[in-house]
Amino acid sequence: MELQMTFQQAVQWFTDFDRCFSFMTKLRWPDGKVTCPRCGSQHVKYLDNARVWKCYAKHSSAKFSLKTGTVFEDSPLGLEMWLPVVWMVVNCKNGVSSWEIHRHMGVTQKTAWFMLHRVRLAMQDDLTGGMLSGDVEVDETFIGGKMRNMHKDRKVEAQKGGHRDGNKTIVMGILERASGSKQKRVRASIISDRKRKTMAPEIAAHVEEGTTIHSDEFGVSWQMPEKYDHQMVNHLSNYVQGNVHTNGIENFWSLLKRGIGGTYVAVEPFHLFRYVDEQAFRFNTRKDGEGEVISDFDRFKMALSQIVGKRLTYKALTGKEAETPREEVPF
């Protein structure tokens, strides 16, 4: 497969099932040793007619396919349908809507919507890059409908809460600036409020001690613990004060809102974190450690390298059952 190819070429390449099968088998088991995703045993045999493997270890579910133990598990759609969708989602800068998938792939809009959320789960940050360090920017933004556009009943309810942004959802972002061989990285999550007791644990979970943290006085106005060097800029007077600014994370907010407002139009708060994960993945896979632009194919492979051990059922997606936690299973 060419490292540089257009979307049209990728679709043509993946129309052949055997080609998809060979590609995914090599990606999942690069050393050629197929392991059972349920028990990790290598005592398996490939059944040509059924296109599945059989594990000879003693457990109830002996047979497994390429999709077992991945975000694709139990999907009636073949890899020749899934792989072009993954390519589109990870490489379209502003995302792709379920209606576009419906039109291009010939599936229902409901199926396309479910497919997209499963791909977003694969794009969720596995935190394999380690803690953020150096110069880090911390900020938050509000996502949701404007007060003036709300129905009267919802507007009254929002005003009762006493929040200037009504019932908008708060997204907190932490961005590590580029330095040397390190490229920009962002971690973003949904938070309930802007209080220190809520934001401080998020910072502690993602930022190394001794890091210089940049924020604006309106956002993180409280003083950081002494283990961090906290620098603040007052946006009422200027946006940049020497090296102190939050321009990097604000650029990420711009990309996030462009995708939500332009591509998806409206996003339910219940699912917002999935769209945040999607944009964060694309942001973090723009350049490699040498500063070279990551190709669409390499970004595509990065997303596929994160499909194992993640499962999202339709009931979990719609809130009818708890979402399955990620399991550590052999890739």
Label every model-predicted segment.
Residues M1-F331:
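Residue-level recognition of single "structural anchor" positions
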